[in-house]
């Protein structure tokens, strides 16, 4: 029997998930959609030949008896409300980041899930499902390089739009590193600091680009994360972990190598969609499989979403103050202590 899924938000990422569930993955079926633009929602049903009902709002979709699970792919500020409604209805919910736009909102979701007493919420941090990151995690967990000491990473985009602001470098871009690195080394963050190197000529007048974020963990690991969103040459994700006994590095995406005209070259991807398309597939398949096989989700938790929110808030404060800022987490609920979200 297929997992019956309702989608809240039929924009770009919503359409991608609808397409992969309908045409690529196993075990799931889209039975309901809703969007603030009802015509757009109806068009998605037509375009993908869905046997799905268009609902006027998230309340009615979540309440539908034939909806087992919900995907929240709407506008970020609307996420918290939809997720809370899904939990209260005892529906499984996959929420694209951000889980909520504030740390307080994330904590409200955490508290509601704890009250439910069941893992219902999965947050869309897809890098945990990328094969390269999985290999890094396995190397670290198996102590291949001993204890991690330092991490060097970079998040580079060829270009960003005119509406991209300085704080978005953290809130929209670095947030993926914030989650992935915390997961990789299983160590909470202690403090953050933001440094602005010389500004790139490619950056718009209102944007500080590039930026370097220095993160210190409670265990003493120091992370330096470069964010450069107008690098021009491609979409480039780097991660190198320096341990006591060696170094492990994120592998480059698979690509042919070309020897021609006295040159040796490989391609660099130009967008995030191609770079992490497989991770998105594995992520949603895991959401479906975990519910069907275990009766609960097993991916990134609401608590992980809370950690990301608190850390990005601290980074934004550090952008403004120029000082080292603390990452002040509340005590982790016992409910989340026993869950592991490593993709095997």
Curated annotation (Swiss-Prot):
GO terms for biological process: inositol catabolic process. Pathway: Polyol metabolism; myo-inositol degradation into acetyl-CoA; acetyl-CoA from myo-inositol: step 1/7. One of its GO terms (molecular function) is inositol 2-dehydrogenase (NAD+) activity. It is an enzyme of class 1 (oxidoreductase). It catalyses: myo-inositol + NAD(+) = scyllo-inosose + NADH + H(+); 1D-chiro-inositol + NAD(+) = scyllo-inosine + NADH + H(+). Keywords: NAD, Oxidoreductase. Its EC number is 1.1.1.18, 1.1.1.369. Pfam families: GFO_IDH_MocA, GFO_IDH_MocA_C. InterPro entries: Gfo-Idh-MocA_inositol_DH (IPR050424), Gfo/Idh/MocA-like_OxRdtase_C (IPR004104), Gfo/Idh/MocA-like_OxRdtase_N (IPR000683), MI/DCI_dehydrogenase (IPR023794), NAD(P)-bd_dom_sf (IPR036291). Homotetramer. Involved in the oxidation of myo-inositol (MI) and D-chiro-inositol (DCI) to 2-keto-myo-inositol (2KMI or 2-inosose) and 1-keto-D-chiro-inositol (1KDCI), respectively. Belongs to the Gfo/Idh/MocA family. This is Inositol 2-dehydrogenase/D-chiro-inositol 3-dehydrogenase.
């Amino acid at each position: 029997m297929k997992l019956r899924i309702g989608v809240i938000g039929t924009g770009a990422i919503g359409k991608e998930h609808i397409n992969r569930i309908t045409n690529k993955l196993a075990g799931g079926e889209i039975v309901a959609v809703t969007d603030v633009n009802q015509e757009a929602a109806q068009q998605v049903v037509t375009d993908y030949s869905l046997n799905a009902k268009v609902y006027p709002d998230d309340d009615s979709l979540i309440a539908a008896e034939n909806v087992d699970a919900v995907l929240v792919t709407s506008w970020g500020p609307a996420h918290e409300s939809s997720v809370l409604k899904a939990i209260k209805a005892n529906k499984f919910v996959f929420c694209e980041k951000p889980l909520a736009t504030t740390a307080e909102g994330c904590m409200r979701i955490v508290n509601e899930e704890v009250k439910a007493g069941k893992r219902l919420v999965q947050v869309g941090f897809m890098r945990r499902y990328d094969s390269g990151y999985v290999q890094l995690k396995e190397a670290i967990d198996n102590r291949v390089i001993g204890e991690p000491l330092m991490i060097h990473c970079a998040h580079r985009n060829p270009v960003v739009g005119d509406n991209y602001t300085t704080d978005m470098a953290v809130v929209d871009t670095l947030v993926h590193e914030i989650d992935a690195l915390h997961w990789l080394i299983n160590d909470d963050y202690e403090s953050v600091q933001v440094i602005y190197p010389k500004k790139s000529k490619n950056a718009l007048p209102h944007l500080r680009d590039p930026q370097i974020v220095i993160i210190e963990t409670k265990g003493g690991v120091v992370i330096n994360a470069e964010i450069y969103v107008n690098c021009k040459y491609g979409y480039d994700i780097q991660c190198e972990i320096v341990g006591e006994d060696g170094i492990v590095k994120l592998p480059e995406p698979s690509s042919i190598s070309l020897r021609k005209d006295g040159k040796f070259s490989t391609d660099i991807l130009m967008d995030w969609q191609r770079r992490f398309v497989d991770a998105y597939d594995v992520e949603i398949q895991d959401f479906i499989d975990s519910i069907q096989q275990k009766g609960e989700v097993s991916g990134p938790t609401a608590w992980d979403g809370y950690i990301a929110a608190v850390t990005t808030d601290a980074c934004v404060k550090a952008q403004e103050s120029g000082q080292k800022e603390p990452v002040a987490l509340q005590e982790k609920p016992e409910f989340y202590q026993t869950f592991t979200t490593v993709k095997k």
